[in-house]
Swiss-Prot record:
GO terms for molecular function: transferase activity, transferring alkyl or aryl (other than methyl) groups; tRNA 2-selenouridine synthase activity. InterPro entries: P-loop_NTPase (IPR027417), Rhodanese-like_dom (IPR001763), Rhodanese-like_dom_sf (IPR036873), SelU (IPR017582). Monomer. This is tRNA 2-selenouridine synthase. Its EC number is 2.9.1.3. It catalyses: 5-methylaminomethyl-2-thiouridine(34) in tRNA + selenophosphate + (2E)-geranyl diphosphate + H2O + H(+) = 5-methylaminomethyl-2-selenouridine(34) in tRNA + (2E)-thiogeraniol + phosphate + diphosphate; 5-methylaminomethyl-2-thiouridine(34) in tRNA + (2E)-geranyl diphosphate = 5-methylaminomethyl-S-(2E)-geranyl-thiouridine(34) in tRNA + diphosphate; 5-methylaminomethyl-S-(2E)-geranyl-thiouridine(34) in tRNA + selenophosphate + H(+) = 5-methylaminomethyl-2-(Se-phospho)selenouridine(34) in tRNA + (2E)-thiogeraniol; 5-methylaminomethyl-2-(Se-phospho)selenouridine(34) in tRNA + H2O = 5-methylaminomethyl-2-selenouridine(34) in tRNA + phosphate. Residues 15-138 form the Rhodanese domain. SMART domains: RHOD.
Length: 367
C-alpha cells in the first residue's frame, strides 16, 4: 500500500496557499468542524461509520475492516471513487485526509491508486492540523504587538479595519457585526470553523510581516462565536486606539448596515415578499433581544417607531424614517454603554482620532 504522505511541516503552507483538501471523514464529523479549503467526500456515510465502529468495539479491528469493505463495495465503492477522481481531476494539486491520517486515509489512497491516481494524504489528519491551528491562535499575540481599535457604534470601525494590512477582521471571520443588530443573512460558522478561520487569518497576517496586529474591539462573544480565551485575554490587555466620528457620519452608516444591506440581502435570497418578512423579523427580533436592557417603556417606543418606519419603507420605498429609532437606540442604549466601557479602558488608550488621523497615526508606526 502506498505511503505517499504530506508531512506536518507543510501544514503552514497548506493553509497559506489554500491547497484543496478532500476530507474523507463521515459527514457528521465534517459538520462539526472543517477547514475552509476542504470538501467532504467521505469514505463512509454516518450510518456505515457507526456500524463499523460498533463492530470494532465488539469484535476488533480485523472484523471492523472486513465489514467496512462489505458495506462499501461494488457500485457503492465505484461511485465514491468516481467522485474522488472528479475532485482530483479538478484539483490535481490537492491532498486527502481523515481524522488521524490513519486507516481511512490509507484505504482511500489505495483505492485511488487502483484507478491510476497517486494522491498524498496528510500525516496526522484533521486532528493534528486542528491542533496546529489552535497553537497558532495561542502564540500569535506574542509575534506582533496587538492594538485594539475602539469606537462608538457607527464610527466605521469594521470598514476601517478592512482597509489596513496590519489588521485581522474578527467580525468578517464570524460573519456577524458583533452587536445586537449584527446578524448576517448567511448565518455564522460553527465555533470550530470560526477558530480554524481565525488561525488561518493570523498565519496570513504573519506572512505579511506586520509588526502590529490591529483588531476591532469585541466582546468575548461575536454573535454565537466565542473568541478563544487566551487570545481574548491578550486583547483585554492591549493598547486601545479610539476612532472618532460625528453623529452625522454615524447615522447613515447604521442606516446602510441595519436597513439597506439587510433588506437587499434578504430579498436577494428569498424574493421580494418573503425577503421583506425576513428583514422585518430580523429588525424586530434584534430589538426584542435587548428588551431587558431597554426596559418595557423604551422597547415599546422603539418598536412603534420601527413598525412605522417599516410601513413607510414598504409603501413608499423611503427608508429615512428608520433614522428615528436608530437615533433613539444610540442615545438611550449604545452610546451610554460605549462610554461606560471606554471609561474602564481609559488607562490603555494610546491614541484618539478621526479616520484620516487614525490612518496617519498607524502609518507613522511603520510596518
Amino acid at each position: 500500500m502506498s505511503t505517499n504522505t504530506v508531512p506536518a511541516k507543510q501544514y503552514r503552507e497548506i493553509f497559506l496557499k489554500g491547497h484543496p483538501i478532500m476530507d474523507v471523514r463521515a459527514p457528521i464529523e465534517f459538520s462539526k468542524g472543517a477547514f475552509p479549503n476542504a470538501v467532504n467526500l467521505p469514505l463512509m456515510t454516518d450510518s456505515e461509520r457507526q456500524k463499523v465502529g460498533t463492530c470494532y468495539k465488539e469484535h476488533g479491528q480485523e472484523a471492523a475492516i472486513e465489514l467496512g469493505h462489505q458495506l462499501v463495495a461494488g457500485k457503492v465503492k465505484a461511485n465514491r471513487v468516481d467522485a474522488w477522481k472528479a475532485f482530483f481531476s479538478e484539483h490535481p494539486d490537492g491532498f486527502l485526509y481523515c481524522f488521524r491520517g490513519g486507516l481511512r486515509s490509507r484505504i482511500t489512497q489505495s483505492w485511488l491508486k487502483e484507478v491510476g491516481l497517486d494522491i498524498p494524504f496528510i500525516e496526522g489528519g484533521y486532528k493534528a492540523m486542528r491542533q496546529f491551528l489552535i497553537d497558532e491562535i495561542d502564540t500569535a499575540p506574542g509575534k506582533s504587538e496587538m492594538l485594539i481599535l475602539s469606537g462608538i457604534t457607527g464610527s466605521g470601525k469594521t470598514d476601517f479595519v478592512r482597509l489596513r494590512s496590519e489588521s485581522v477582521d474578527l467580525e468578517g471571520i464570524a460573519n456577524h457585526r458583533g452587536s445586537s443588530f449584527g446578524r448576517q443573512h448567511e448565518g455564522q460558522p460553527s465555533q470550530i470553523d470560526f477558530e480554524n478561520r481565525l488561525a488561518i487569518e493570523l498565519l496570513r497576517h504573519q506572512e505579511r510581516e506586520q509588526a502590529k496586529l490591529l483588531l476591532e474591539d469585541e466582546s468575548f462573544l461575536i454573535g454565537r462565536n466565542a473568541i478563544p480565551k487566551t487570545f481574548f485575554e491578550k486583547m483585554q490587555q492591549a493598547p486601545v486606539l479610539v476612532l472618532t466620528s460625528t453623529l452625522e457620519e454615524r447615522l447613515p452608516r447604521l442606516l446602510d448596515d441595519y436597513v439597506h444591506k439587510m433588506h437587499a440581502g434578504y430579498v436577494e435570497r428569498l424574493g421580494e415578499e418573503q425577503g421583506f418578512i425576513a428583514y422585518r423579523d430580523y429588525l424586530l427580533g434584534s430589538l426584542k433581544g435587548i428588551y431587558k436592557r431597554l426596559g418595557g417603556k423604551l422597547h415599546a417606543e422603539m418598536t412603534e417607531l420601527m413598525n412605522k418606519a417599516l410601513a413607510t419603507e414598504q409603501s413608499r420605498r423611503d427608508t429615512s424614517a428608520h433614522l428615528d429609532w436608530i437615533s433613539l437606540l444610540l442615545e438611550s442604549y449604545y452610546d451610554p454603554m460605549y462610554h461606560y466601557q471606554l471609561g474602564k479602558k481609559a488607562a490603555r488608550v494610546r491614541f484618539t482620532g478621526t479616520h484620516a488621523e487614525m490612518h496617519e497615526y498607524l502609518s507613522s508606526l511603520g510596518k
